[in-house]
């Protein structure tokens, strides 16, 4: 939540500028370390400390938000698929431009108990595993509503900000 909320303005402008930066955001649907407040990624209707009657706000679609802002690399991974996560991080770091890696990660204490009503961390882990599928280029969600994992978007055609600035500086010095 913090990256999408408090840090959201910085994230959007880094994507807009296509700064050569890799952001890895752990998405656990909640502000878990501060007591369980609603976050920008909290599911609609979820019960939290700050939405006791259910979250009346729809969560950000970070993929669409950042793609619209100008991000040139977007991957969504899960801690339930560590090899895919490792590969996405390597690919994101190698990518020239703004790379965003969303990592679905359980928060068994706050989100697990309060939002999803799980009794154990392993129950939440199993739920995460059941909610995901590998990305198919046609859709970011499968037909059965599962969340698509993988590299969802790459644009290698946009220039990276620092390269543009260096080119301008060099042209100016001639």
Where are these regions (language model features)?
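Flexible, low-complexity linker and terminal segments
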Residues: 105-174
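Thiamine diphosphate
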Residues: 1-32, 86-87
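Short, hinge-like loop/turn segments at secondary-structure boundaries
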Residues: 14, 39-43, 117-120
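Short acidic, glycine/serine/threonine-rich loops at helix termini
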Residues: 6-10, 33-38, 111-116, 163-164
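Histidine- and/or cysteine-centered catalytic micro-motif in compact active-site loops
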Residues: 36, 79-80, 104-106
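Conserved thiamine diphosphate
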Residues: 39-91
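Short beta-strand segments
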Residues: 22-27, 102-104, 152
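Generic secondary-structure signature for well-ordered alpha-helical cores
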Residues: 16-19, 29, 64-72, 90-97, ...
């Amino acid at each position: 939540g913090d990256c999408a909320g408090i840090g959201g303005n910085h994230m959007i402008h880094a994507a807009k500028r296509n700064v050569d930066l890799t952001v890895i955001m752990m998405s656990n649907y909640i502000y878990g370390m501060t007591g369980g407040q609603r976050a920008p990624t909290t599911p609609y209707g979820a019960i939290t400390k700050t939405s006791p009657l259910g979250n009346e706000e729809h969560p950000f679609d970070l993929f669409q938000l950042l793609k619209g802002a100008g991000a040139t690399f977007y991957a969504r991974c899960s801690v339930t698929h560590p090899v895919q996560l490792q590969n996405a991080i390597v690919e994101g770091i190698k990518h020239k431009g703004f790379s965003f890696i969303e990592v679905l990660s359980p928060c068994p204490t706050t989100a697990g108990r309060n939002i999803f009503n799980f009794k154990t961390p392993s129950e939440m882990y199993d739920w995460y595993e059941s909610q995901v599928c590998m990305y198919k280029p046609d859709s970011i969600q499968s037909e059965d509503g599962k969340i698509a994992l993988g590299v969802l978007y790459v644009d290698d055609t946009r220039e990276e900000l620092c390269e543009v600035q260096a080119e301008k500086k060099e042209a100016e010095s001639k």
